[in-house]
Amino acid sequence: MHNFFAKKRMTAFLFILALATFSILNMIHSFEPLKKTLASADYRFSNAKGIINELDADINEHVFEKFGFVEAYGYLQSLMWKNEENNFEVVKDTEGKLHYTYFATGPTDTKELSDRVAELGAQLGSKTKLTYVMTPDKYVRGYTTFPEGIPYNYNNETADGFLDHLKQSGIDTLDLREGLLESGIPAKDLFFTTDHHWKIKTSFWAFGQLVQHLDGLYLKPLDPEHYFTDMNNYNVIPYKDFFIGSQGRKTGKLYAGDDDFDLIYPKFKTNYSFYFKTGETEATLNGRFEDALLTTYPLNVKGAAYDLTADKYFTYLYGNQGIVHVTNKDNPNGLKVMFIKDSLAVPMISFLSTVVSDVYLIDPRYYTGDIIDFAKKTDLDHVFVSISPQDLVDEFFPYGKNNVEGPFTSSK
């Protein structure tokens, strides 16, 4: 009997010791982020809930060996042949690609959102054209299938309804879901396995489709010799088994593997000015395409494969910035265009900069000014709205809802 209770006490002691050790390691690991949050906090009573939420987020984000636990959990799920993780937050299709999804009974009504785009068009000057560019969803119709029991979110059907409303309002549209399977890119290589974004080669194909669409709207073609839209005139640097995307960071690479990444940039001479501002952070860069429009930090960072700063997709245009202005100094008489966009469009816009004069990019999530007011005050030939099917939600269509003066005023 004595030995029985001794074993119990020893087990309890080891459990408490492990718990205490892990707690101490967690506190050490999260101390600096917690200290920073507390130092910048507004200690008014009305902000108490917000401070608690920030501290909770800091602790959850800086768990000791967090991604070791993620990998272990993902590996267990793979051993059980499971096609979903964390209550269907991330699911696998029959090809092994990861998806964000949720339970839905049908498409979402987006007429209010399409009406906002129509209002944007109505507010633009008579010389400024408006086009909605619908980028494809990772669930590619005619190719992607889910295993039995995996929910479908009706993103494509929602996008169909949204585009129908725009067409009824007389808005020009380009649906990049059309022709995707005829692009010459193998269907399995259109999107990353562990990320919701399309691959860089797919976005380059989309750039060509966009140029072709614009050639039908303007008397002077953007690329009459088909030089800038020819992949042979670009360097393609492959990185094998190099990228873990946003979905893979939730499951671990033992569950889904990792992705190859292609860095594509011009072989020909280029000369750019690149300005961006998000919040209090702003910068200006000048030089060739690869010097001004690309950041190699995500490609070179070591030991932080799961960190957001290592996201290879953000190599282009420094990811999602509130406001961006790209000037192609070699094409001063080209079109001046503006994109209201989400992250999917970023590489495509990077390539489009080779055939236009100026590109402005606004991310509605991070820009604090009035988007319509900015578009009206800026000398523009064309405004594009490019929000992907999964992002057809209120957050990406705040037009006219914010009357704060924009933090960036064009001199053009």
Model-derived regions, located:
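Extracellular glycan-modifying ectodomains
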Residues: 1-412
